[in-house]
Amino acid sequence: GTKTGQGMKRGEQWPVPSTIAGVGIGLRTPHIPEVLDTTPAIPWFELLADNWLAAGGLSLDYLHAVSERYPLTLHGVGLSLGGTDPLDLGYLANIKWLKERCGAVWYSEHLCFSQFRRHHYHDLCPLPFTHEALRHVIERIRKVQDFLGEQILIENVSSYLRYRVSQFGEGEFLARVAEGADCLLLVDLNNLYVNQINHGQDARRVIDCLPAQRVREIHLAGYQEKAGFLLDAHNHPVAEPVWWLYNYALRRWGQVATLIEWD
């Protein structure tokens, strides 16, 4: 079996799949019949795990049919990876089952919290960049990886608030989490740009901090302009400054599997 988490010996490597490459898109329900009917030349699709796990959710027959034709990845929003409630092992068991069922190459989740005392927020709340949060989330990611038996990808989120105390910049925090938990990174460049405009941080400096060998995927999306801030809305084309960041990132990291989000 696969050695996992804290059981890995120094110098040993996790098995890293390599069937996801090029530019993929998120698979949304209205498109599935057309995708199955016409088999468009798209390298890979991302599945939103929570859509498939929901009660009365999508037909697993569809899932099987798509998985026979395309490589897939699994993306989650429901784990509350940085939260203080106990990890939901039932949810994780469902993720593991779904991943095995569709043969997804990897599973990614957001570095955030989305519930507190079992109350669910309809938002992905950012973590404070502190030593305490760092230790906490590293421990939780290790537990998740031990449960799943593989590395996961963690994604940076957009932010619309600032904490009073920050002991790291966002890039250093992400890098320390990835190294400490021995996990991989999904870098959302639209979120970095949104945070640059909203909070004045330099997205390029965040990119500079991230270890290239940990970056497994990039997300691109469009933002929405609000009164005095940007919103990560996924309902606009990718903006020119985000394409510029993408070019900057690829010069540093080489070719990275990329997903364009549109909702």
Predicted regions mapped to residue ranges:
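N-terminal pre-domain/capping segments
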Residues: 9-97
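Active-site-proximal loop/turn and secondary-structure-junction residues that shape catalytic pockets
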Residues: 29-31, 49-51, 60, 78-80, ...
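Distinct, well-ordered alpha-helical segments
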Residues: 32-36, 163-179, 195-208
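Acidic (Asp/Glu)-rich catalytic clusters
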Residues: 34-40, 57-74, 90-105, 144-147, ...
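Conserved, mostly hydrophobic/aromatic
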Residues: 45, 107, 188, 218, ...
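Gly/Pro-rich active-site loop or hairpin
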Residues: 54-56, 71, 124-134, 195-253
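Active-site acidic/histidine proton-transfer and metal-coordination neighborhood
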Residues: 88-185
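Conserved active-site loop/cleft motifs that coordinate metal ions or position small ligands
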Residues: 257-263
